[in-house]
Amino acid sequence: MTIRSSMKNNAELESKSVLANESNIISTFTRRIIKEKSGNYQVLKRSLDGKLIYPEATGISSNRGNKLLQRSEVVTRRDLNNSKPMIEQTVFYNGSEHRLLQTNIVTDSRRKRIKFTPDINVEPVLVGDENDIDGSEKEDENITDEYYGEEDDDDLSKLVNVKEILTPILSLGDIINHKTISRTFSSPILKNLALQIILMIEKEQMSVVRYSQFLEVFLGDHPEPIYESNLNLPSYNHNLTLPEDRGASDEDDINNKNNINEVNSNSLSTEAGHINNGMEEFGEEDPFFALPRLEQSNALLSLLPSSSGSASISTLTAAEQQQLNEEIESARQLSQIALQRNKEFIRNLQKIRKSVIKANRIRGRILNWSREYLGISDDDITIPVALRVVKRGLISATTNKTTNFEEEIENTMEDGVVDDNEPDEEANRA
């Protein structure tokens, strides 16, 4: 009995140890998986079957037609020309990599810390053992100050001047003197946007040309340019040589005619049937009034797959021919819809560009008015006093400024009269 009981105890202990080991293995495996999957990565964009992973959207100018690419949502209205590669900074912690959502700007290897100004009237109330906590916090502050160097903390109320931002405009001079407003009116962002929009319009116009050529293939036209050699026109003597020069150029004409006859014999051999039919119908046709004889383009047949090419179309069954015709019709409809959408997109871009240019023109006029109001000369151009007074009067008439403007006009007019009289006195003396 003792042997059997000891064997049972050993078996139970071994089973417990095995279960413990299995539970440890499972727990470590789950922790490992959780650590590897805990990174805040975005889900990759894949195809419907999940086999194809779309590439990254690097070097694209717009997300039109590129929305399936990775990180295509980063392309914003503010930065249309996104030619820079989108490389994200990552940090490794907790067993996996994480994307950095925000980076702190470090200057002179020192870290700036922001503290909120506490209310002076409110005194802190200590409860329990908060004295020890304050002591430990002071020690931590000393450690951080020693580590980051002796630098004063930045006060949040001093970093942002709310009063300066929310102060209304009293005159046109505030557009130049007010820092926040002058930064807005002197920014070239509207000009850059207009330039980027016109570049996008040119790019979309090229795609419109390609779609148009593709539709011409479905209509049976020639998508490529048509040259004189493809028109199959009969030979015609234009009589461009003078009678005096004919004798000197007879030998050259004979040689050229021989070469031309050789070329025409090769090219017109395949067209003899068409020409004979035309001659039978219309009789003798003047080569000067002859119409070009163009054959139907074979560009559509070249686009078909090899199994259903021009040589084997006749061997297809009725079901295969019907399926092929449906595919051709669907491709034509889709290309026509794409062409219409592309033209509509170009029209919308043109409207947007007109609005942006108009806003930029108004911004420039307001900025120039404010410069003239303050008497700031552009490019060393001096404005006469009388003209300056008239302009300031017109500008002030359209604004709400009512402060001692008449006195300023009188003073400037007196100065202007004195300045204008000086040259006359010198002229009288002379």
Swiss-Prot record:
Region (Disordered) location: 408-430
InterPro entries: Rxt2, RXT2_N
GO (cellular component) term, any one: cytosol
Keywords, sorted A to Z: Chromatin regulator, Nucleus, Repressor, Transcription, Transcription regulation
GO BP: any one term: conjugation with cellular fusion
Localization: Nucleus
Domain of life: Eukaryota
Family matches, as Pfam families: RXT2_N
Major localisation: nucleus
Extra remark: Present with 1630 molecules/cell in log phase SD medium.
PANTHER family per record: TRANSCRIPTIONAL REGULATORY PROTEIN RXT2
Quaternary assembly: Component of the RPD3C(L) complex composed of at least ASH1, CTI6, DEP1, PHO23, RPD3, RXT2, RXT3, SAP30, SDS3, SIN3, UME1 and UME6.
Family note: Belongs to the RXT2 family.
Function: Component of the RPD3C(L) histone deacetylase complex (HDAC) responsible for the deacetylation of lysine residues on the N-terminal part of the core histones (H2A, H2B, H3 and H4). Histone deacetylation gives a tag for epigenetic repression and plays an important role in transcriptional regulation, cell cycle progression and developmental events.
Protein name in UniProt: Transcriptional regulatory protein RXT2
Organism per entry: Saccharomyces cerevisiae (strain ATCC 204508 / S288c) (Baker's yeast)
Lineage: Eukaryota, Fungi, Dikarya, Ascomycota, Saccharomycotina
Gene name of this polypeptide: RXT2
